[in-house]
Amino acid sequence: ITSNTLSSSKIFQKIKFKKTIHQFFPIDTNFFIKKFLNYWKPSAAFFIDSEIWPNTITNLKRNKIPIILINGRITKKSFNKWKKISYLSNDLFSKINLCFPSSKQSEKYLKQLGVKKIKFIGNIKFSQSINEKLLSSNINIKKFISFKKTWCASSTHKTEELLCGAVH
């Protein structure tokens, strides 16, 4: 599991998932992202909330690594900023293989920005039955991954490490 903060690393150390390690995710530059991907060779990348890292997403796609956005969230302000550079954002957002938006509004924005495969299951942060919703969503996440042991959850927050561990 990857994250960008010391606090999330400390939380991960307390949980102690078996057969799982924590790695800090690199800064979103081509040089560091390429080195990271070449070393870890993830089979899929899971992003949570509003994490849109252009260089990371571009390099993941270039390496044919599926990109899944969980609880995808985008504000009106952010949507308007992305729309101003639609010549870049449409290409970037179209690289996302699968998106579970957190709200109907985010679903609308993400579609307009270029995400093609979207399945709305609600905001999983407030869900009591995350696993049930994901399993009953009729989306087979396994077809997007090749069953390697390495994967990436970039820039997670305090409450998201448990979900990442459960998914892994």
Language-model features and meaning:
Residues 1-135, 156-158:
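Active-site and donor-binding regions of nucleotide-sugar-utilizing enzymes
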Residues 130-168:
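Conserved catalytic-core segment of nucleotide-activated headgroup transferases in glycan assembly
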